[in-house]
Amino acid sequence: MPKIKTNRGAAKRFRKTGSGKIRRNKAFTSHILTKKSTKRKRELRQGTLVAKADQKNISRLIPYI
């Protein structure tokens, strides 16, 4: 049985925590930043966890990470 390929796009966007949960970065941080408040941009810098409903699908994309 061959190994499962890692989805390289997902590998660059997600990483697993020590307890096995999946971390992600928030969106809306790359452009059109002048109209966003400093507080909003600061809060967008903080990473967050993937929703429980999406966790299984993302785990399949990054099996060895």
Curated annotation (Swiss-Prot):
Keywords: Ribonucleoprotein, Ribosomal protein. GO terms for cellular component: cytosolic large ribosomal subunit. GO terms for biological process: translation. Residues 1-28 are annotated as: Disordered. Pfam families: Ribosomal_L35p. PROSITE patterns: RIBOSOMAL_L35. Residues 10-26 have a biased composition (Basic residues). GO terms for molecular function: structural constituent of ribosome. PANTHER family: 54S RIBOSOMAL PROTEIN BL35M, LARGE RIBOSOMAL SUBUNIT PROTEIN BL35M. Belongs to the bacterial ribosomal protein bL35 family. This is Large ribosomal subunit protein bL35. The gene is rpmI.
